[in-house]
Regions:
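Bacterial Sec-dependent N-terminal signal peptides
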Residues: 1-22
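Outer-membrane beta-barrel transmembrane domain signature
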Residues: 20-45, 73-122, 224-318
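Transmembrane beta-barrel domains of Gram-negative outer membranes and organellar outer membranes
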Residues: 20-195
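Residues on the lipid-exposed face of transmembrane beta-strands in outer-membrane beta-barrel proteins
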Residues: 56-58, 67, 151-157, 184-190, ...
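Residues that define the transmembrane beta-barrel architecture of outer-membrane proteins
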Residues: 61-63, 144-149, 177-184, 207, ...
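Transmembrane beta-strands of outer-membrane beta-barrel pores
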Residues: 71-75, 167-171, 190, 215-221, ...
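Repeated loop/turn-to-beta-strand initiation elements of outer-membrane beta-barrel proteins
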Residues: 76, 160-165, 193-197, 252-255, ...
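Outer-membrane beta-barrel proteins
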Residues: 76-80, 174-177, 197, 220-224, ...
Length: 343
């Protein structure tokens, strides 16, 4: 799962990143195109990383601990695998040849060739740059989903509460990619305010049905720094999760479900200096000269998600060892599985 995650995340900062550098030469058109091209991977990351916070409404006993190691995958809807190129949306970017349906980063191979046409009305000249549209990484993946591994430590608190901490140290790749995660969540029991009654011996009955509320915040820093130049891509993702949880908890098994809300914010900055060579032509298509242009820090992009979510899952409990899995219905459905340890 870790290898799969690195392939998906770092592909847009390293190998596939080089494919759409030429887009930056299209001035303001670049932000529109790159936003559409990269949107599914960032939306998927926000949904995937904001999952798997809880596996029961029952809080951990005060000052006891639970360690969960899980992996989530946000499945990319088919309509996010490509986008239609509408010439009216762009000032300089055009299709040279090929279909106007262009793959996103989570799509397949591209069959489209693009061109940038910048007219100079004063001298009746045009600047022309041609290149292949970037392709996607769908064929490199076992399933078309954006993955997100997570390690979470939880501690029980007094008053029927629990705190969750997520942390991933900075992961780096040989080509300059990096990733770091930090998140915190709090769960509070609602069912504790409803008495369960007493048995025939005067002892409190065992509670099997539990209700709780949970809130969480998470931040991710990731990106790519070219070790041989000043080029870089820096990504920051912040997410918020609010949910109500219900669970049936028995000695060996917990069945849980939740209904909640997800909110996410993402920024991506493309930094550095990029040089481009234009073929300058007259209005009849005759070559006049080659002109080189430099562009610095070409992109600052913003993405956001918000919406309701509903989840169902189970947890198998074997002494101190646990196995859990669940599925969340939302814009990008998320499947989660993992193991846990209680101590």
């Amino acid at each position: 799962m870790k290898k799969y995650f690195v392939i998906v995340l770092l592909s847009i900062f390293s190998t596939n990143y080089a494919q759409f550098e030429d887009i930056f030469a299209s001035d303001s058109d670049a932000e529109k195109f790159v936003t559409k091209y990269t949107q599914p991977v960032f939306r998927g990351l926000m949904f995937a990383t904001n999952s798997a916070w809880v596996t029961s409404a029952q809080p951990i006993k005060p000052f006891h601990f639970e360690l969960n190691i899980g992996a989530s995958g946000a499945f990319v809807p088919q309509n996010y695998e490509s986008f239609k190129f509408n010439p009216a949306d762009y000032q300089y970017l055009r299709i040279d040849n090929g279909p106007d349906e262009i793959p996103t980063v989570m799509g397949g191979d591209s069959q489209t060739r693009l061109k940038i046409v910048i007219p100079d009305n004063a001298s009746n000249e045009i600047k022309l740059l041609e290149f292949d549209a970037p392709g996607g990484i769908k064929d490199q993946l076992p399933v078309n989903a954006v993955p997100a591994p997570a390690i979470q430590v939880s501690m029980g608190l007094p008053l029927g509460s629990e705190v969750n901490l997520r942390y991933a140290p900075t992961l780096t790749s040989d080509n300059g990619g990096f990733f770091q995660l930090l998140g915190i969540g709090v769960k509070h029991s609602i069912s504790q305010y409803f008495p369960v009654g007493e048995d025939e011996n005067g002892n409190d009955k065992k509670r099997h049905f539990n209700l709780a509320a949970h809130v969480a915040y998470q931040n991710i820093n990731a990106g790519y720094d070219d070790q041989n130049s000043n080029k870089a891509v820096h990504l920051n993702i912040s997410t918020i999760s609010l949910q109500g949880i219900a669970s049936f908890d028995y000695k060996l098994l917990s069945l849980y479900g939740s209904v909640g809300y997800t909110k996410g914010f993402t920024t991506m900055d493309v930094l550095g200096t990029y040089n481009y060579s234009y073929d300058v032509q007259d209005t009849n298509g005759n070559h006049i000269r080659t002109e080189t242009v430099s562009i610095t820090d070409p992109l600052k992009l913003n993405y956001d998600v918000n919406g309701m979510k509903a989840k169902a899952g189970f947890k198998l409990k074997l002494a101190f060892f646990q196995i859990f899995a669940d599925y969340t219905i939302q814009e990008f459905p998320v499947a989660t599985a993992g193991i846990g340890f209680k101590f």
